[in-house]
A protein has these predicted regions:
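Anion-binding alpha/beta catalytic cores of soluble intermediary-metabolism enzymes, centered on
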Residues: 1-146
């Protein structure tokens, strides 16, 4: 909410209007002016399914792609793949493996690259104010020097 208010990012929230409103109210956040997408009523779902079937050819059929797209990790990854979003944040909802797997399957790595990495930022309130820690490669590349 603060990052949106400060113009740092423009979020897209995934879920039903009721789910999003309840989560925002519970957290004390405003979702006014923030784009929301309900995967159950997404007007480009057929294009998304077709592209996902093509990307996963031989590994997932149309029915399994539709089922996967009911999960926000796959739906959000496809938004990135289709150029509708710039990135996906999902580590609070899904494990690292369940967040990275759709990206590796659908977006893939740069040609010639076999190593992926990750990072996350932790905030902690202390006597001195807010402390911020950037953690890199904690869950994916356990020994980045190799």
């Amino acid at each position: 909410s603060r990052l949106h208010t400060e113009g740092i990012l423009t979020p897209i929230l995934l879920g039903t209007p009721t789910e999003i409103k309840e989560a925002a109210t519970k957290s004390g956040w405003s979702v006014n002016g923030i784009e929301t997408i309900d995967p159950n009523n997404y007007d480009q779902m057929e294009d998304m399914v077709s592209l996902m079937v093509e990307l996963r050819k031989g590994k997932m059929d149309e029915a399994s792609c539709r089922a996967a797209l009911q999960k926000s990790n796959y739906f959000g990854t496809m938004l990135v793949k289709m150029g509708k979003a710039d990135c996906l944040l999902g580590g609070a909802t899904y494990s690292t493996a369940d967040t990275v797997r759709p990206a590796l399957q659908l977006i893939k790595t740069k040609p010639g690259s076999k190593i992926v990495s990750s990072c996350f930022i932790l905030y902690r309130q202390s006597e001195n104010g807010t402390e911020m820690y950037a953690m890199a490669d904690c869950a994916i590349n356990l020994d980045p020097s190799e």
